[in-house]
Amino acid sequence: MKWLFLLAALLLAGCVSAGPAGGSLDSIARDYVKLQLAIGEKEEGYIDAYYGPPKWQAEAKTAPGTPAALAQRAGVLAVRLSSLADGRLDPIERRRRDFLLAQLKAASTRLAMMQGAKLAFADEAEGLFGVRPELKPLSAYDPILARIERLVPGAGPLADRVDAFQERFTIPRERLEPVMRAAIAECRRRTAEHIALPANERFTLEFVTGKSWGGYNWYKGDANSLIQVNTDLPIRIDRAVDLGCHEGYPGHHVYNALLEQKLARARGWVEFTVYPLYSPQSFIAEGSANYGIDLAFPGDDQLAFETRTLYPLAGLPAARAPQFLALHRAMQDLAGARFTIAADYLDGRIGRARAVELTRKYQLYSAVRAEKSVAFIDQYRSYVINYGLGMDYVRAYVESFGEAPERRWAAMESLLSGPTLPSDLVVP
């Protein structure tokens, strides 16, 4: 693949122009953080979170360097890391080194893209997130559509029927905040029963508009998050628990808080004070956040909580709640279709209008929601694999520890608290 040769060339250039090679993991980690901050000056949104020394951020703003120069710096750091032989490192240090190498590969890939490299969707996903997605033909999802047809019978296009059914479960705007806060509180309660959260952890909830995403966690450091919920489109009641777990507990908020507590603070690993969005770390973040919903609400727990608490708060009748949740779960099996649509669209095999049309058919979205979904692909590209594929990886790993809830939660906490890479989740 052409991009691999490009990365090799960047590494070679780094070797030729390198300063001192080797060094300790701590010194390499400091240079890594400064490099990531400098890359962040070249692309808005590249840095998802930073809570390290303000001085380093100021330095990056003053003299970030060109993408080519930053690529050379990434190559130098990769060489320095590779010079640290296994025999010199204990097991946790080897994991730390491997994590840094994987993050640097992603940074080099993104820098290559900034310089005009055109990568195929699967190559881009592998370069940025450390996993090569399987892209099934869309026809592979037709049996799932047939199953959903039986859940929502009637005339007209299936996407229209699904959307009309789901609209009955829209949370009124004036009731949205109490519903969301109740959902987040329950997600937190269930998580705290199994994971010891930092004593000062907290979040702020905001409602926003004008975004391509539905929810976002902006981690501020000191166990503090800003959770934003986008209200461009009506929010259905199933999204309350989904967002509460995904953005909060045991999702992004808990993941970032544990990394800060266990690695950045307790071990002094400064590389965890910066979170580059386009990196294997996002595969872990999105996958664990999505799986965290099922972990926190196993079996019929979500349905019971929603009908007991959320439906009354939203002022919605709960008579058809079981059918609504069954539809929601069936539609999750269509997640992989989004990868195929994104790949065909970004690789130029279909145009935008066709991508919207296929999103309507294979994600069962209204026209407006399909447009929003493709807008997300426009902005974040191969990042879309992290949700469904990441969840599959995390689920397989956590559930390999057995059916006992305490064992699954312990596996989840370990996953969230360490320098975990996608390759660590591969179950033999």
What are these regions (language model features)?
Residues 5-14:
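Bacterial N-terminal signal peptides
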Residues 15-428:
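N-terminal maturation segment of proteins
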